Amino acid sequence: MFKETFAAALLLTFSLTANAGFVKTDWKSSGDSLSVLHEETGKEWLSLTQTDGMSINQVIAQLGNGGTFDGWRLPTASEVEVMLQDSFLGFNLKTGKNTYMAEGYNDAYWKEADTYRKQMGGTDYRVVDGSYWAHSLGFHLDDTGTQLQNSGMNHFNWKATPRLYEFNIMNQVSVDSNNWDASSTYYGVYLISDGGTTLSSKLDPTLNINNPDAPINNVPVAYLLSGLGLFFLSLRRKQSKNR
């Protein structure tokens, strides 16, 4: 209870936004925008562009100390579900393939598709003879850690005149082959961090404060209190000087 109260005080003190959303962060270098923070959960997702074309097994081999994806982990299906639901508010997603059709030159779902593609990273984008395909899809495992699934979205038009658009939101769709060595140019692999992996979260650990498993929430309370006390002391001194 005390830790929760203290975390709330930190949120107010440093004026972090209370609105749930997705904000680009930097993974390795300033300005690379290769990760995204889900503010509501305090967890960060790696851009699918970094795992595009890889299999689950290839990614697993690069997790852990010294690997390409050191500090990242595979998300649970429940974490993917929360991310998808917050990405597509108002769609009332069911588990499986959610399909939406639109006809005419006013593409009803372009905004949602483009936002997600930019947010999570595009895994394929092509324009051929007036038709286009946009994919942002990723492999992950179900909550038992045994079944290969895919989630994300694809958006394309079937024909040019009249235009017929199809928008699919994939929510934990099981891969029939369950082959962990399967890979595709249309798919990446979802990776998530609890904090302290990206450059952004190293520079500002409070980015992950909404995640109870974040490093900032595992710092001894006495240490945090001393830091907060110094902050308020310096604030009081500044106020005294201005009187």
Feature roles, as predicted:
Residues 1-4, 237-241:
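Positively charged n-region of N-terminal signal peptides that target proteins for export
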Residues 2-8, 221-226:
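Sec-dependent signal peptide recognition
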Residues 15-18:
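N-terminal signal peptide c-region/cleavage motif recognized by signal peptidases
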Residues 20-30, 202-209:
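Boundary/junction segments of secreted and surface-exposed precursor proteins
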Residues 31-91, 185:
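Short aromatic-cysteine micro-motif
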Residues 176-202:
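Short, structured beta-strand segments at or near domain termini in extracellular proteins/domains
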Residues 216-236:
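A short, hydrophobic C-terminal helix/tail in secreted or cell-surface proteins
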